[in-house]
Amino acid sequence: MKKTQRYERRLVEAREDTIGVMEQYKAEIEREKTRQNASHNEFVRTCCQQEINQLKAEKDAIELEVV
């Protein structure tokens, strides 16, 4: 495997790890939503989802380059 492909694979893995953390954080916010301000929670959930979507798009783009 070329050095570039290994680097790209590590980028994909890092994105996957980050997505996992963001999804866990999002789930935690969902559990806490009854204890905190609902409008603030909605804002944070929306931001998390946007970040997750962006990271997934970047991961998919990198995977396409690797193939």
Residue map of PLM features:
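Positively charged, hydrophobic/aromatic-enriched amphipathic segments
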Residues: 11-15, 58
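Short amphipathic alpha-helical heptad-repeat segments
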Residues: 17-33
